[in-house]
């Protein structure tokens, strides 16, 4: 038995929600360790759809403990809204099934506003990153700048005013520079007071909780958000998110030592998608790209934005395997490729006439690389609902084997539809 870390190996939207839900039945605890409510997923359980952006997937399953770690930035208003929405769907969230790290950073209204101000200014200058305008980046900035308001601060009214002063000294200077009205100290105090009673009952010392549960033999599932190529360090900077999304962050963002993380499962789509700005070497602007988007229903859960689509990029996923120490992958949306006459896989790039086997860190070079493809025969048969290798066409199996060889990691799970049971289990990560 081992713990399992789930990470996206591409630009997010790889189908982590279904796989995490599938694994959560085997877990005792499900932990979010980075990001905020800027990435969402939909779970379908007994015909009911649950849309989650901040809460760990475990909250919708009875008997599971969901944990939000210190690496997450928490918008208390979004948290309360998500809890209330689930309550109306019959899922009651209490301290018995949800705990929040006392040292997690809060996203406030001023963070959301600053995010929007900056994106508007960047749009005018052609330097837009394409954020969700939800305040994620500004909240992480305050965390690193040591001026953030954290969950525990809601319980300490004696020291809170001084912390708000420090926060506003920074933010009001920015707002003046942007030509925006300053925010009063009382407005922030009122905002914090309005959410404290709803948030504090869930507060806990998460690192200690997880350590105790680990020693008792609990199975812990760490649920990543976004994807490796959106990592602040290892992604396509600056078109990235504001946190580390790689597996190592599961330790830093929860307080669990890295030696206890266990199996690293990389969720990997059978083709490639990306939302928003940034380089995308295998992007398709033709009818195949349109086919993938329509067949794969490639629209964002949180923003509704249309995703850009392209061929599978083995060079990029190979980098993700290395950066995360991926043990095995869950290959998703294989069924979307049904019916294509031929399939291409990117195995590397050319840059200035030279062949390279990885995506450079340089923004200019990332924009200049050209993909090098191999071509495989497609398949006409349907893979939808396949639950064993015997259900798959021979060419589909060849495609999967080629992916494994090129990325240097085995397929542990294979998903053939959005339905959670339409999954081929090769290796149970909890038993590996």
Curated annotation (Swiss-Prot):
Keywords: Cytoplasm, GTP-binding, Ligase, Magnesium, Metal-binding, Nucleotide-binding, Purine biosynthesis. Substrate binds at residues 301-307. The keyword Ubl conjugation does not apply. Its main location: cytoplasm. Binds 1 Mg(2+) ion per subunit. The keyword Ligase applies. Pathway: Purine metabolism; AMP biosynthesis via de novo pathway; AMP from IMP: step 1/2. It comes from the Bacteria. GTP binds at residues 12-18, 40-42, 307, 333-335, 415-417. GO terms for cellular component: cytoplasm. Plays an important role in the de novo pathway of purine nucleotide biosynthesis. Catalyzes the first committed step in the biosynthesis of AMP from IMP. This is Adenylosuccinate synthetase. It comes from Sinorhizobium fredii (strain NBRC 101917 / NGR234). The gene is purA.
């Amino acid at each position: 038995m081992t713990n399992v870390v789930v990470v996206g190996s591409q630009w997010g939207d790889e189908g982590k929600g279904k796989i995490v839900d599938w694994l959560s039945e085997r877990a005792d605890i499900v932990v979010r360790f980075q990001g905020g409510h800027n990435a969402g997923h939909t779970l379908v359980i007994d015909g009911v759809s649950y849309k989650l952006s901040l809460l760990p997937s475990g909250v919708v399953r009875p008997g599971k403990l969901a944990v939000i770690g210190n690496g997450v930035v928490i918008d208390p208003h979004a948290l309360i809204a998500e809890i209330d929405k689930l309550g109306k769907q019959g899922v009651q969230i209490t301290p018995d099934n949800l705990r929040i790290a006392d040292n997690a950073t809060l996203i406030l209204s001023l963070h959301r506003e600053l995010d929007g101000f900056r994106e508007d200014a960047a749009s005018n200058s052609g330097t837009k990153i394409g954020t969700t305008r939800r305040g994620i980046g500004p909240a992480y900035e305050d965390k690193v700048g040591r001026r953030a308001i954290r969950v525990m601060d809601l319980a300490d009214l004696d020291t809170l005013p001084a912390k708000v002063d420090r926060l506003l000294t920074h933010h009001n200077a920015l707002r003046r520079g942007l030509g925006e009205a300053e925010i009063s100290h009382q407005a922030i105090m009122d905002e914090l007071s309005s959410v404290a009673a709803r948030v504090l009952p869930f507060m806990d010392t998460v690192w200690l909780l997880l350590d105790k549960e680990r020693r008792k033999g609990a199975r812990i599932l760490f649920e990543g958000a976004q994807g490796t190529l959106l990592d602040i360090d290892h992604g396509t900077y600056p078109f990235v998110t504001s946190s580390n999304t790689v597996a190592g962050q599961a330790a830093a963002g929860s307080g669990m030592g890295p030696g206890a993380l266990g199996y690293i499962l990389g969720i990997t789509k059978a083709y490639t998608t990306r939302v928003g700005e940034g380089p995308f070497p295998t992007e398709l602007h033709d009818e195949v790209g349109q086919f993938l988007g329509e067949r794969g229903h490639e629209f964002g859960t949180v923003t509704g934005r249309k995703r850009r689509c392209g061929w599978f990029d083995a060079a990029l996923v190979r980098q993700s395997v290395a950066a995360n120490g991926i043990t095995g992958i869950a290959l998703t949306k294989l069924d979307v490729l049904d019916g294509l006459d031929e399939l291409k896989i990117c195995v590397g790039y050319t840059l200035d006439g030279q062949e390279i086997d990885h995506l450079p860190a340089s923004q200019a070079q990332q924009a200049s690389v050209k993909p090098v493809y191999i071509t495989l025969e497609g398949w006409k048969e349907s893979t939808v609902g396949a639950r064993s290798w015997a259900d798959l066409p021979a060419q589909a199996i060849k495609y999967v084997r080629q992916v494994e060889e090129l990325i240097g990691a085995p397929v542990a799970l294979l998903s053939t539809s959005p339905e959670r049971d339409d999954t081929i289990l090769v290796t149970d990560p909890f038993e590996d």
